[in-house]
Regions:
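Short polybasic amphipathic segments
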Residues: 4-9
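N-terminal flexible segment immediately upstream of the FAD-binding catalytic core
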Residues: 11-13
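Active-site nucleotide/adenylate-binding loops and adjacent lid/helix of ATP-dependent enzymes
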Residues: 15-142
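Flexible, glycine/charged-enriched surface loops at secondary-structure junctions
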Residues: 1
Length: 142
């Protein structure tokens, strides 16, 4: 429904899920999943590929990092979900500064990463098993 809360299964085998969090998700998992930078670090430590980039604290750091990793880039809030505030495929300094200025109105905790072209999949795992997967498609007009 509109609340974003779903039930998978029934009775004692059933699970309640909101976004990516189920009634079986522990607090540490929730905290990690809400922090994109921490999630990125933990994935990297486990040798799971992540986009090159880091947290930035000001526009000078932002521009230096963009120059280092190369355009196009992505900027996004460190905390959040559902793609809110994520600005993709910024191709030059002008686009980056405009996006950064806009994002600063929402948060000062900002991550910049190399833009990697490809598909965006959302995977739902319950009890260490994949129970659902979806391809996320950005809204568009035909």
């Amino acid at each position: 429904g509109k609340s974003g809360i779903y039930q998978i299964g029934y009775g004692k085998q059933g699970r309640i899920i909101e976004a990516a969090i189920s009634n079986k998700t522990n607090c540490v998992g929730v905290d990690i999943s809400c922090d994109k930078f921490l999630t990125k670090q933990l994935l990297d430590i486990q040798n799971i590929p992540v986009a090159e980039g880091r947290k930035v604290f000001n526009i000078i750091g932002l521009l230096r990092e963009a120059e280092f990793i190369g355009y196009p880039v992505v900027i996004k809030p460190q905390y959040g979900n559902k793609g809110k505030g994520v600005m993709l495929n910024l191709k030059n300094e002008k686009e980056l500064i405009k996006a950064y200025t806009s994002l600063l109105k929402i948060t000062k905790d900002i991550i910049i990463e190399k833009y990697v072209k490809g598909n965006d999949y959302r995977i739902c795992v319950v009890d260490y098993k994949v129970v659902a997967a979806s391809l996320r498609v950005v809204p568009f007009v035909i």
